[in-house]
Each structure stands twice: as structure tokens, then as C-alpha cells.
Amino acid sequence: MSKIIGIDLGTTNSCIAVLSNGKPQVIENSEGGRTTPSVVGYTEDNRIIVGLPAKRQAITNPKNTLYAIKRLIGRKFKDDIVQKDIKMVPYKIISSENGDAWVEVKDKKLAPPQISAEILKKMKITAENFLNEKVTKAVITVPAYFNDSQRQATKDAGKIAGLEVLRIINEPTAAALAYGLDKKKNDRIIAVYDLGGGTFDISIIEIANVDGETQFEVLSTNGDTFLGGEDFDIRIINNLIYEFKIENGINLSGDSLAMQRLKEAAEKAKIELSSVEQTDINLPYITADKNGPKHLNIKITRSKLESLVEDLILKSLKPCEIALNDAKISKNKIDEIILVGGQTRMPLVQKMVSDFFEKVVKKDINPDEAVAIGASVQAGVLSGVVKDVLLLDVTPLTLGIETMGGIMTPLIEKNTTIPTKKTQVFSTAEDNQTSVTIHTLQGERKKALQNKSLGKFDLNNISPAPRGVPQIEVSFDLDANGILNVTAKDKKTGVEQSIVIKSSGGLSELEIENMIKDAEANLEIDKKFEELVKCRNEADSTISIVKKKLKDENLKILDEERVSIEKSISNLELLIKGDDIDSIKKENEELLKLSDNIIKKK
């Protein structure tokens, strides 16, 4: 049986793990990193690059380098949070035909799942290189507070990348699996505080030994899918823009190249200030005016950073209160606080979380790797490699339908253990009504319009009758991935309509199929480019070796032989500048043949 991989598809960084001899192992990428930047770059020669190579060229190619795409996945263009992001990123965010938030790169319109699929493809290839076998199945993590649309969009991304997503698992739950599996302790309740690059989650989880099984039961979850390290970076960037404008009278916010440099510098400074009290941000030639080039040189202290972001950390504590209330437990019942996500390395985050829970936070798991490790454990459970583990997760938000008067009527309450199925009987609002519209909603507001619309469908051919007489049975079936199937049935006639809820936007099957084909085509382009680079490098190495031999004073060689070799070198140097692989290989072989004579005569 082929391996099932565990992937943490993060806003800022992604990570991949697999069970090896029953133990989770984080897999290093081709650059030697244990995490991969969630960055996708589109180059001038129409190549797609992912991870560190994409991040490295972001400064010189800001409009075609995409990052923090996870913040757009499953969202509408008109959402306030998307509109806020438009002002902060150098790339172009647009509205698709159905109103979803997409991006435009080099005159091509791309859906967030399509871009996320490029990151997943890199993860897939990394795993295949490590395992030396084809990988087709994965467990992918999402923020616990992701709604149905965002979960479905993540599954779509996996499909485009050529992966069968066997399970979507909540990030804090995955971290709990990573933390609690090997710890042979008494039953305990933990709080997983997960502050990542773009999202925040808090989950209250009970770990118990039940009849020889380690049971992980999520008691409650809450969060904010638009709060994370990217927001901390933005605060630093805005402060740098403000300071520079005061000193130089120039506003850098309209300069995409300068903004990309500021972003990189802000992220670097933020990381440094977790271990030092002060750092310098030094960006020469950040811009220019009529008097010449301008340089940015600003000192930033840890206390200054803390004053800039303290309210963001406070914002994360409100969901913690709600999660405790929903779980019906007090702070003193929490045995351990687990920190997950790179932003939790910040000392002020650790202090404020510790103060809130009135307990010292745990720092004995790697916050960047725990989620991927947990995903690999869940993959092991699904494949039967890991036994005696039971995971009971919950739905983060209430699911219901719109009923008469524009009210949201819940069917599945938030924090209900999944998978689950709930059925409720409704009726018609008018006499002789022959059809009803089932409008599915997700959220906590009483007014239907104030909740997230997941989609609508009609149940037709209802037997005419006075209002209130027909019995329409509505069933909500929520699977282990947190994805919803809705069925409506006229109990008298047996007429039934059933759909898997996809948001009123989302990707159609045809769009997904086209994106899969596009991804496969790009994979061939990437392979060809990789072969070209390898071929060029081999030729370059041959040229270097032969040139070195020609300079050897002790070399005995005829003038015409030297001329032939030098001509071959010139030809090969010219061919290396092109992209004809066969010609490069042929000339390289010719040069090697000619140089063999040198070796024999030496």
C-alpha cells in the first residue's frame, strides 16, 4: 500500500511529514528546509517556481509573486477582509465571474485553489523523492475555524495537485495528536493556541485513555481566519512607511518594489526581535527623488514592536474565552497549554497567553512542524498503521437553513462532534406551494443574511396543500472532513433532492479538470526545464575541465587538435545560452571525445 502523507498547508510556510517505521518524520525539501515558504512565483520565461526560489525573487518580481493565498481561499471578492488585503499586497486580486476572490498574474486569472495546488505539488514531489515511490493520497490540515467553502476549496487544491485528500483535519487537533500520542500520562485537558502566518485557532481538547485507546476529543474550538503573523508584519511595514515619510516626505506605499523589500525586512526584524532587544532595518536605495537616492535606516526595539501588535494578541484572547465557555470548563481545569504556529515564538505572545490561562505555556514541540506531524499520524490511523487512537473532532460553526421571516434555523450546532447527521421537518409558508428553496447557512447570527451562505437548491413537485400541511424533511450530513451534504424530501410523495454543498461560488468540476490539465502541462514544462539546467551544468563542467587541461604547460597536443577543441568549446558555450537539449548533449559528447585525446597524451 502506498504511503499517505500529512501536509500542513500554511499561510506563510508549509510542511510535510510521513510515518516511517511507525514514527512521524518531517521531510526536507530540495533546498534542505524542513518547511517550505508558501510562495509561488511566475517568471518572465513563463515558469512557475515554488517555495524558497520564489521567495528569493519576490523583490525583483513583486507583481507576479503570490504569498498568503490561504487568506483568499474560499472567500468572496467583496468580503471586507479581502478588500483590506488588496491594499497590502503587490499582486492583483480580482473578482471571478461568480464573485470569488481570484488573482491575476501576467494577464492570466487564477483561483486560490489553483495556486495552493502549486505548493501541494511541491510537497508531493518532495515526498516522492524521499520515499522513492509515487504519492497519490494525503491528509491536509486547515484552520479549525475554516468554513465549508474554505474546506471544499482546500480539497479542490489537493485534487488539482494530483492528490486524493482522504481527510481534512483541523490544525489544532493535528497538533494535539503530535503532542499527546507518545505521552503516557493520565487523562488531561489541553488548550491548543495556534497563531500561524494568517490564521488563529484555539481548541480545547481532552486526551483520555478509553479501553486501551488514546482518545482525542475536541470539546470546543474558536478562532479568526484573518489574524496571524502577516498582520504583525503589516503593523511593522506601516510603521516603517510612517517613519520614512516623516523623515523624507516620501510615501513608499505606492511603490510595489519598495513594499516587497519592506515586507521582507519586517518579517526578518520580527523574527530577530524574539531573541534580541533591538534590530536595525537597513534598506539602501529604497527610493529616489530629484536630489538622488534615498536610504531607509530605522532602529526598532522589542518594546516598540510589542506596542504595535499588542492589540492583535489581545484580539486572539477573546476566542479563547468563548472556547472555554463553549467547553463549559474554567481556566483552572486546563492542564497544559500547547503553542503552535511560528508567531507563538514571540515572547509577548507567550506571556499574554500564559497570563490569560494563569499557567506556564508548554514549549516542548516545534511550532512549525507539529501540525504536519499530527497530519501524518492521522494518515497512519487511516492506513491502519497507527492503532488504538480515536479522534473526535467538531464542527466550528453552526449549520442551518433560512426559514420564514429571514431567520436562521440551526440543524447542527457549533462544536458538535463529527461526523454527524441531523434531520428536521419543515413545511410550506403559502397555500398550494409546489416548491421550496433550501438555503443553507453557516454562522452564529439569528438573521439569515448575516451568516455565510453555503448554497441554495430547490425541491420541486411538492403536492399542493394548505400552508403548514406538507412535511419537508431536511437532513444535514456532515462528514469527517467538515463538508456538508444536504437532502430535502417531501415525506408524502417521496420526492427528494440531495447535493454536496459547495459555496454559491467555488470551482465547478469542469474548472477543476481544466486546472488539473494545466497543472500536468506545467509539470512537463518544469521537468523539461530541470533537464535543460542539468544538461547546461554538465556542459559547463566539461568546458571548465577541458579549458583547465588546455592551460597545462606539460600538455603535448597538436595545433590542429587545439583548434578543434577550442572550436567545440565555443560551439558549446553558444549552445548553453539556448534551450536545445539535444544539441547541447551532442556537442558536449563531441567535446568529451576530443578531450579524451588530451588525457591519453598527458
UniProtKB/Swiss-Prot annotation:
Tell me the protein family, please: Belongs to the heat shock protein 70 family.
Which SUPFAM superfamilies does the UniProt entry name for this protein?
Actin-like ATPase domain, Heat shock protein 70kD (HSP70), peptide-binding domain
- Please state what the protein is called: Chaperone protein DnaK
GO MF entries: ATP binding; ATP-dependent protein folding chaperone; unfolded protein binding
Instruction: Kindly indicate whether the keyword Zinc belongs to this entry.
Output: no
Do you know which HAMAP family this protein is assigned to?
A: DnaK
Upregulation: By stress conditions e.g. heat shock.
Q: What does this protein do?
A: Acts as a chaperone.
- The entry's keywords: ATP-binding, Chaperone, Nucleotide-binding, Phosphoprotein, Stress response
Question: What does the record give as the organism's lineage?
Answer: Bacteria, Pseudomonadati, Pseudomonadota, Gammaproteobacteria, Oceanospirillales
Please name the Gene3D superfamilies in this protein's record: 1.20.1270.10, 3.30.420.40, Actin, Chain A, domain 4, Substrate Binding Domain Of DNAk, Chain A, domain 1
Modification sites for Phosphothreonine:
T199
One Pfam annotation, family name?
A: HSP70
Q: Which organism is it from?
A: Carsonella ruddii (strain PV)
